[in-house]
Amino acid sequence: EATDHYIRSNLGMRHFAIKATEDEMHQDKNKCYQNWSTPLETERIIELLLNVRLFDDEYQGFIKTTMMSCETGKDRLARPLQGNKAIIGHKTGTGDRNDKGQIIGMNDVGFVYLPDGQSYTIAVFIKDSEESEAATARIIADI
């Protein structure tokens, strides 16, 4: 509740909900659907992280550095950037499978600095995938 309230009150975000903890979602997979956001709203948060002082510099820098050293999901957003000098900071997420055998959610959210000086933010969410984890990750990379 505190995180949901902070994001709504202090960041002005409306198109999301944080209702369940990770433990609660692992215990009851239906609770995964209570936590949601739109890709655009998530990109807005990344833009704020990059361009607005949200926290003390130490903490905000830690978040950015952690995203740039992300070891998971190299087969997602990072895959098409491998081999060039782009810098990517991202955070991945992979949900459990629901009772139908679908991956409840797989995502990758982040920012990219291209060698030519251009930059962008990106958020790709896949819900209820019937594909394998590898195939779902390829879909994210292909976007």
Enumerate the language-model features and the residues they cover.
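Structured C-terminal helix/loop/strand segments within mature extracytoplasmic catalytic/sensor domains
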Residues: 44-87, 92-143
